Structures are given as structure tokens and as C-alpha cells.
Amino acid sequence: MITFKLKPAKEKYIQILLVIITYIMIILRFLLNEKGRVSPDSIRYMRQSEIFPVIDNTTAPLGYPLAIKFFTFFELDHFWSSKLVGLLAYTVILIFAYRKQFFFKELMIISSLFSFVSIFSFTMSEEMILPFVVIYFYLGRQIINQKYTLAKGSFYLSLCLIVMINIRYSGLFFCFGNIIFGLMNFRKNYWKTFGLSGIVGILFYGIYKFTFIDYFNEKYIDTFLEIGLKPTSQLLLELFQGMATTFNPFIHIADPNGGIINYGIYGIGVLTMLLMLFLFIKTKLSDTEKFIVIGSLVCIVLSYFIQYIYSVNAIDYRLMAPFSIGIWMVFFRKLFTVFGALTYTIGFASLSVGFLFTWLSKGNYLENRKAITTFLKDENLMHSKLKFYVKDLEDNDVQTAELISTVNPHIYYTFTASDTLKNDVLTRYKVEKKISIKKNKYQ
């Protein structure tokens, strides 16, 4: 066993340095991106925040858009509000973990991993759900240690599950993880608390579906539920690639064009998972650690099987973030037991790789934002409802729409080519013939 110990004062300095660098990297991650780390889904979140209380879709819950909306009351626009949500999510995790003495060192390193830096800098709901996942695991520990009565524990855990479902529908998976963990421990006093709260969460989703989703979108089931979307061979390949990048502590994005570099990226992820498996088997897991690992694995398994009937993006580090964070927590706790303070080097190494990647592929969001703002003002479109033509959402033209959405989020896609003849429909060509947008060197 190679254990490296530091004096508390020196370890504290290392922790402070790691946190400061992580904050800086989160900010640089979106400022040095040509469009500020947004995606087509980000447009939907910011647009929903902009037009609320009007509901224009139920593809995602209202939790994240409403959080963005809240900070717009402090003179921030929707883009900057979303970035503040990410920074606050990171801050809440640190403060909560420190005050409760709950995996504090582990969560500090996890948050410094480049994949999680990318999450906190992304205008996506995963950033907001992460603090509640940590709180959920903490509540599980308290219940296992019998700190709560059946009623109190069930109430707190049910409330946390309901909050997560209101941020991401995949929060429902934690309900099933709850029930399975409870059934696996049916001889212990706390099993009823986990089972009951899981059932409450599922019942809440059922009520939510019939009273909210169906009310605003009667065709939700017809639109998103479709059996046989992808063959098993493709899903298994995507699962392997997604898991290998999710559990790569340094690089979470593979080269879509393939190449030898992907062998290294996937290889590191596979080795990390094998090391996790070895440590989890070799060292005895506590009941709390079992709860965290089992719940996380159930969510990952359900994320795979849901793809057979539900239209969703391929498994990747972002979709897996709420489910991988728990496994990372237990893994880093085991690494601290074996290597001590040397474990901090993983966080610093990941930040270094992340900075190199960010710098080599850097764009200039602030400059591009200035150009887009000028364009929208000149065209009197700053506060108008916009339409933007793209062939499909995989088209590179989408990036121009994403950039526009950071200034005016009230934008919709149109896929009808004839719409490009209309004056009120924007295209990439119409925008870029009037302004210059600086692109990332590496897409």
C-alpha cells in the first residue's frame, strides 16, 4: 500500500488551489468556446425560460428553465443566468459536502475532472441535478445509519427524488434504484424507507405525466416512444464508447472521425473501470457505499434499456453524469485509502489536460457574442421571435443558431427549405454574410 500523507495545513492549501483552478476552468471552458457551450437542447431550455409562463414543449421538466428564469430577475440574460446556475451547482456541492463531512475530498476531485468541468460550464440540466444527487446519497446514508424515522426518512428521500424528476425525467431511474436497494436489504430496518420513497417518486411521475405532460403535449408518447429505434449491435457499441469516455478521468470526448487516438481514450476509460471493479471487490463496501454504487448502476442499466423504446441521445459523459458521480465518489474514497494525498494529482492532471484541450481548440465567445448582438440590433431582431433554417440538427449550421440563442433565446428551428425565401427566416448564410464569426480550430 502506497499511502502519502500531508499535514492538514498543506492539504488545505492543495484543496484551496484545486477549487480555485476548477472555478477558473469552468469559466474558461465556455468563454473559450465559439458559442459559449450551448447545444440545440440549450436553446430549448433558454427559450422556455424566456417565454414562461407560456409552455411551448414538455420535452424536459421545468426545473432547470425556471432556475435560469429566476436569475434573470437580477439583470442577467438567460445565457449568463445558465452559467451562474452551473457555478452555483458546483459551489453547493462543495459547501454541502464540507458542512456534512460527506465525501468532501472525493467530490472536490470529481468536480475538477475535465468531464465535470464541461458539465458545469454547459447550459444543460445535468449541472443542476448534480447537487441533488449528492444530497440524495447523503440522505441514503442518514437512513442507513438510522438517523431518521421511517416517516421522516421517507419524506426527505421522496422530496429529493421529486426535485430530481422536476429537473430531469431520468431522475425517475433513482426511484427504481431505491426500490431495488430496499428489496436487496429487506431484512434490515431501513428497507421500507427506500422502497416507500421509490414508490412515491414513481407515483409522482405518473401524476406529473397525466396532469402536465399530456395536457401541454397530447402527442408526447407518439413522438418519443418508438420501439426498435436502434439495433442492439449499435446500442452495445454506443454503451461501450459512452462508458469508456464517461469513466476516463482525463478526456471524455472521442474523435468522431475515428483513428488511433480513440484507442488511447477508450483504453484509459476501460482500465479505470477495471480498477474500479477490482477495488470494489477487493475492499469491503460499507452499506452507504453499496447504496451509492447499486443505485448508480441501476440508473446506468435503465439508461441503456430505455433506448429500445424512447428517443434519446447516445449514452455519453453528459447523460451519465448524474449516474457516474456516485461511482466516482466511492472510487476516489478507495483511492484515498490506498494512495492518500497522491489522489489529488488526478484532479490537477485532469485540469491540465482540460486546459490544453480548451486552449488548442479555443474560440472567442465574447467576440462572437458582440458580433451577433450587432447583427440582431441592426436587423431589429433583438427581442423578436426568430426562425432559423437547418437541414437537420446534425448540420453545422445549427452552431450559428446556438450562438444567436445566447443573445435572443426566442428562436425556433424550421426544416422546410422553402422557408429560406422568407425575410423573417434566418440562415447561416444570411447571418455570416454580414458578420464574421470566429470558429474553433477543432470541431
Language-model features: where?
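Signature aromatic-anchored transmembrane alpha helix within multi-pass, membrane-resident enzymes
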Residues: 19, 108, 152-155, 159, ...
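Membrane-embedded, lumen/periplasm-facing catalytic core of multi-pass transferases
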Residues: 46-50, 349-441
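Membrane-interface alpha helices of multi-pass inner-membrane proteins
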Residues: 116-117, 152-169, 175-180
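Hydrophobic/aromatic-rich transmembrane helices and adjacent perimembrane loops
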Residues: 46, 50, 126-128, 132, ...
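Transmembrane-helix signature of polytopic, lipid-linked glycan biosynthesis machinery
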Residues: 28-36, 114-121, 163-165, 206-210, ...
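Aromatic- and kink-enriched transmembrane "portal" helix at the membrane-lumen/periplasm boundary
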Residues: 30, 62-65, 79-93, 109-132, ...
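Extracytoplasmic catalytic/substrate-binding loops of multi-pass membrane glycan-assembly enzymes
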Residues: 32-47, 55-67, 365-368
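Membrane-lumen/periplasm interface segments of specific transmembrane helices
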Residues: 190-274
